[in-house]
């Protein structure tokens, strides 16, 4: 019984990685596909990379600490702060959830941290 449970726990990260990797490329334009790289790095337009550990070592959310070697921000660095709403903007509120690029970056980082070395 213990062997069965332990083998299932070992296979779970592999199944998650295969599901995420197959679903991340469906419906994506060819030009956007080149922006992604494996191993937790996010290739930006300038050719610089943002790594998972760089992001998780930063200060808490909404207090951005720019690393001195990075000139462009990571996908999750862009945050639109709360601004005073005018009459027309009150009805079109955006939620404070991160962008799609940031969500993809963070899920990739979390999956890599769960993956066990084989």
Curated annotation (Swiss-Prot):
Alphabetical GO biological process terms: angiogenesis; cell differentiation; macrophage chemotaxis; negative regulation of inflammatory response; positive regulation of ERK1 and ERK2 cascade; positive regulation of macrophage chemotaxis; positive regulation of monocyte chemotaxis; positive regulation of vascular endothelial growth factor production
Q: Where in the cell is it found?
A: Secreted
Name the gene.
CXCL17
Write down the species: Bos taurus
Q: What is this protein called?
A: C-X-C motif chemokine 17
Signal peptide, first to last residue: 1-22
Keyword set, alphabetical order: Angiogenesis, Chemotaxis, Developmental protein, Differentiation, Disulfide bond, Secreted, Signal
- Return any one Pfam family short name: CXCL17
Role noted for this protein: Chemokine that acts as a chemoattractant for monocytes, macrophages and dendritic cells. Plays a role in angiogenesis and possibly in the development of tumors. Acts as an anti-inflammatory in the stomach. May play a role in the innate defense against infections. Activates the C-X-C chemokine receptor GPR35 to induce a rapid and transient rise in the level of intracellular calcium ions.
Instruction: Give yes or no: UniProt keyword Cell membrane.
Output: no
Stated family: Belongs to the intercrine alpha (chemokine CxC) family.
Cysteine disulfide partners in this protein:
74-102, 76-109
GO cellular component annotations of the record: extracellular space
């Amino acid at each position: 019984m213990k062997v069965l449970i332990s083998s299932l726990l070992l296979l779970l990260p592999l199944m998650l990685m295969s599901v995420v990797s197959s679903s991340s490329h469906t419906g994506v334009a060819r030009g956007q596909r080149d922006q992604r790289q494996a191993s937790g790095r996010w290739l930006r337009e300038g050719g610089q990379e943002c790594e998972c550990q760089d992001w998780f070592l930063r200060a808490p959310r909404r207090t951005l600490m720019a690393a001195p070697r990075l000139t462009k921000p990571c996908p999750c660095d862009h945050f639109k702060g709360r601004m005073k709403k005018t009459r027309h903007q009150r009805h079109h509120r955006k939620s404070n959830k991160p962008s799609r690029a940031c969500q993809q970056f963070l899920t990739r980082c979390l999956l890599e941290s769960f993956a066990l070395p084989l």
